[in-house]
Amino acid sequence: MLEDNERVDHLIKEGYEIIQNDEVFSFSTDALLLGYLTEVRKNDKVMDLCSGNGVIPLLLAAKSTQPIEGIEIQEQLVSMARRSFKLNDLNDRLTMHRMDLKDVYQTFQPAQYTLVTCNPPYFKMNQNHQHQKEAHKIARHEIMCNLKDCIEAARHLLKEGGRFIMVHRAERLMDVLTELRHGKI
């Protein structure tokens, strides 16, 4: 089940296990906060964007019996998420799609979800001090998707009156608010 440099960490509160790999990218406090502070309602249909190794779907699965989906572009992270779902016997409820956020328009009908969560890359692509590892760059910097892409994907996926819950850095608050306004969310 584990590949090179992988380990199993425990989500103690939820009673779940998750496969992580520091060579690719491991979740941090911001992902935990997003998962812990997001309310999943009884009839929610849930999609997690920029899903990484699937930590948000796992955290949300502990709060609900609803099916939860995620979208992630990096193949290795998708594999880790899928294996974590299997490890926790959640394959019947959790699904991870390997795809570019820009492809949601061709893959998903509009207005199908009541809750969309997102832990996007925080740093602009041209920011100095990018990580040396490509997987870390993609997870942390707006290389494969930017804030606008995340918000537009959420808008496409959300039903009228649906909720979009995102975590981001305080210094990007004005960017977030501007894109939310442009995206009409």
Where are these regions (language model features)?
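Conserved Class I SAM-dependent methyltransferase catalytic core
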Residues: 144-185
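Class I SAM-dependent transferase core
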Residues: 2-41
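Short beta->alpha junction loops/turns
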Residues: 23-24, 74, 169-170
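Conserved SAM/SAH cofactor-binding pocket of Class I
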Residues: 36-118, 123-129
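Glycine-rich, phosphate-binding/catalytic loops in enzymes
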Residues: 35, 132-135, 183
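Short loop/edge segments at beta-strand edges and connector loops
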Residues: 20, 98-99, 168
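Short secondary-structure boundary/capping elements
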Residues: 26-30, 52, 142-149
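Mobile active-site "lid"/loop adjacent to the S-adenosyl-L-methionine
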Residues: 120-149
